């Protein structure tokens, strides 16, 4: 193929055999070293360092090396739009029925509160009582978060703030007010 001053734009090949043939025919020039006779090498052409075209001043060769590789080997990592993963997690956790607070840390906290508030003789809990207490605590927290979210939406915000929790506790009559 003769060198021309202006580069001809070509349409993309339809299948991979055309892509390999088109990249080798485009690559025949000063930037490649063919290993077969006549420059018909398909996959056996060797790329050298990309050079700068004197007419346009653009780099050639880097784009060709990307086109020569099969498309299946370059896996682009998919990035979800902001908020999609959060909604997916919300749906996932709403479907679950198990407890979300780790049992060991919850039991440790219950024992420390019992040690601070109860007399020294009372320091033992049955397993059923701890499970019931954990279920009640998680139910209370879920209700508090949902009421707080309603307060934030009422204030035309999406972000939960401390004042939303305070207002939800005051309006719900749960717990002591600040």
Curated annotation (Swiss-Prot):
One Gene Ontology term from the biological process aspect of the record: cell division
Residues annotated with N6-acetyllysine modification: 63
Keyword terms: Acetylation, Centromere, Chromosome, DNA-binding, Kinetochore, Methylation, Nucleosome core, Phosphoprotein
Modified residues (N6,N6,N6-trimethyllysine): 5, 75
Modified-residue entries (N6,N6-dimethyllysine), positions: 5, 75
InterPro entries in the cross-refs: Histone-fold, Histone_H2A/H2B/H3, Histone_H3/CENP-A
Alphabetized GO MF terms: DNA binding; protein heterodimerization activity; structural constituent of chromatin
Stored Pfam families: Histone
Residues the record lists as Phosphoserine modifications: 11
Subcellular location, record wording: Chromosome, Centromere, Kinetochore
Biased composition (Polar residues): 43-56
Compositionally biased intervals (Low complexity): 16-36
GO CC field: chromatin; chromosome, centromeric region; kinetochore; nucleosome; nucleus
Entries under Gene3D superfamilies matching the protein: Histone, subunit A (1.10.20.10)
Flavoprotein recorded as keyword: no
Region (Disordered): 1-81
Keyword DNA-binding in record: yes
Signal sequence, renumbered to the chain: none
Residues with the N6-methyllysine modification: 5, 63, 75
Domains (record comment): The C-terminal histone fold domain is sufficient to direct CENH3 to centromeres.
Known role: Histone H3-like variant which exclusively replaces conventional H3 in the nucleosome core of centromeric chromatin at the inner plate of the kinetochore. Required for recruitment and assembly of kinetochore proteins, mitotic progression and chromosome segregation. May serve as an epigenetic mark that propagates centromere identity through replication and cell division.
Subunit structure as annotated in this protein's UniProt entry: Forms a nucleosome-like histone octamer containing two molecules each of H2A, H2B, CENH3 and H4 assembled in one CENH3-H4 heterotetramer and two H2A-H2B heterodimers. Interacts with ORTH2.
Family the entry assigns: Belongs to the histone H3 family.
UniProt-recorded name of the protein: Histone H3-like centromeric protein CENH3
Organism annotation: Arabidopsis thaliana (Mouse-ear cress)
């Amino acid at each position: 193929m003769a060198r021309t001053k202006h580069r001809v734009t070509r349409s993309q090949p339809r299948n991979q055999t055309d892509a390999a043939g088109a990249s080798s025919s485009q690559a025949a020039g000063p930037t490649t070293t063919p290993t077969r006779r006549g420059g018909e090498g398909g996959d056996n052409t060797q790329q050298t360092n990309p050079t700068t075209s004197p007419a346009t001043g653009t780099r050639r060769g880097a784009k060709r090396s990307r086109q020569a590789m099969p498309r299946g080997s370059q896996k682009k990592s998919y990035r979800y739009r902001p908020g999609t993963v959060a909604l997916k997690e919300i749906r996932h956790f709403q479907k679950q029925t198990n407890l979300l607070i780790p049992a060991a840390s919850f039991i440790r906290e219950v024992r420390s509160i019992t040690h601070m508030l109860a007399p020294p003789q009372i320091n033992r809990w049955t397993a059923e009582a701890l499970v019931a207490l954990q279920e009640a605590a998680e139910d209370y927290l879920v209700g508090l978060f949902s009421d707080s979210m309603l307060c934030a939406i009422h204030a035309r915000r999406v972000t939960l703030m401390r004042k939303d929790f305070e207002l939800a506790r005051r309006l719900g009559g749960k717990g002591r007010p600040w």
